[in-house]
């Protein structure tokens, strides 16, 4: 019996299931030739589709281009932006972009495919000049509200003499700090133009997204106060763990680091998902719900999450437990030609997944790729409970 068992096990091991690339076709998309000539200019930090099928793409040096996927032709829509990190298309002539100093609406008034008007939707937050004060987003809910998230500053660099907004030195030069409002927060812009500080406690919340029911999620990157990278269900007024942002919470007094950890932990809302550091993700990015209704594979309603350090896209399945969310994470597409720096994603009209790559001087790569399901069902773990 023993030799037969050994032979049987060897036979099973030799029939290992196919890699994910057997079920999804990966394609690298050529970028604008004028950007390809400039070092690091082809970092893609925002993607969305127009109703007419064009792709809107923002690049790290401040350009927004549109791509006609049928012809492969690129056209410059706008430039002069400051490190744009996301796009929401409103219609065939308008889009909203998050750039470092503001959330901006770009409008093509005459229909020639070039933005004529730049409108500030919100600049109701502080800027100290620290390099790490990113502005992530936006995303838009069914009621027309926009949400965006602000990164904290890094002790790896200081602040500028001229700042925007009030300066609070109580957290200055902590590992990651929020010396101006509302660093480490998610903010909401209402349809009538009000900016509302929505939730606090984030370190580097590089990625916002909704599930199919309209619940808002944000990822956060590992570091001080964030033992491993996480994904949170964002709700108004909640605090999610990074203490620096508490300086701008109404009624807060004193230096957050001087408060006992049990006191801070008592007001913290726990994450929905933890990404094991190194094994799963070091720098998770945008969560994107599979809204294709099964046309991208058997994962409808689950979330795909990018990762900067690896050539990996993760998959997250959530469930409701005692009024909150908890979930599992698993690698979805790992290696097999996928670049690192998977910073922004969007589903196209043909239900393929478009992926923008970036590095910002750290881990990652540059470029634009897309994944297309070939209709074969992969041998994968679908969900847990």
Predicted regions: what they are:
Residues 1-5:
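Positively charged n-region of N-terminal signal peptides that target proteins for export
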Residues 18-385:
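Beta-propeller domains with acidic blade repeats across secreted/periplasmic ectodomains
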């Amino acid at each position: 019996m023993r030799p037969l068992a050994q032979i049987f096990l060897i036979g099973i091991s030799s029939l290992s299931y196919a890699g994910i690339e057997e079920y999804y076709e990966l394609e690298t998309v050529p970028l604008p030739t004028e950007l390809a000539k400039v070092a690091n200019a082809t970092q893609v930090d925002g993607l969305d589709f127009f109703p007419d099928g064009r792709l809107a793409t923002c690049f790290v040096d401040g350009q927004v281009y549109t791509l006609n996927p049928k012809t492969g032709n690129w056209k410059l829509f706008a430039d002069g932006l400051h490190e744009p990190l996301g796009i929401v298309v409103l219609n065939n002539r308008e889009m909203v972009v998050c750039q470092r100093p503001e959330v901006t609406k770009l409008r093509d008034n005459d229909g020639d495919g070039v933005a004529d008007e730049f409108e500030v939707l919100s600049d109701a937050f502080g800027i100290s000049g620290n390099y790490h004060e990113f502005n992530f987003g936006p995303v838009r809910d069914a009621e027309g509200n926009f949400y965006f998230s602000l990164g904290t500053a890094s002790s790896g660099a200081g602040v500028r003499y001229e700042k925007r907004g009030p300066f609070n030195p109580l957290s200055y030069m902590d590992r990651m700090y929020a010396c101006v409002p509302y660093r480490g927060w998610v903010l909401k812009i209402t349809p009538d133009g009000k900016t509302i500080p929505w939730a606090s406690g984030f370190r580097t919340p590089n990625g916002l997204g909704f599930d199919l029911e309209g619940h808002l999620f944000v990822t956060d990157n590992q570091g001080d106060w964030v033992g491993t990278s996480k994904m949170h269900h964002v709700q108004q007024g909640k605090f999610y763990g990074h203490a620096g942002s508490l300086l701008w919470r109404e009624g807060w007094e004193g230096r957050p680091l001087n408060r006992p950890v049990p006191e801070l932990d008592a007001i913290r809302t726990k994450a929905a998902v933890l990404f094991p550091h190194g094994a799963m993700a070091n720098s998770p990015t945008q969560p994107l719900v599979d809204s294709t209704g099964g046309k991208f594979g058997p994962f409808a309603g689950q979330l795909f999450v990018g990762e900067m350090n690896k050539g990996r896209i993760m998959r997250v399945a959530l469930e409701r437990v005692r009024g909150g969310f908890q979930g599992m994470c698993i690698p979805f597409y790992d290696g097999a030609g996928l670049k690192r720096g998977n910073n922004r994603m969007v589903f196209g009209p043909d239900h393929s997944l478009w992926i923008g790559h970036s590095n910002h001087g750290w881990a990652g790569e540059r470029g634009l790729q897309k994944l297309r399901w070939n209709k074969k069902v992969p041998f994968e773990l679908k969900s847990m409970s």
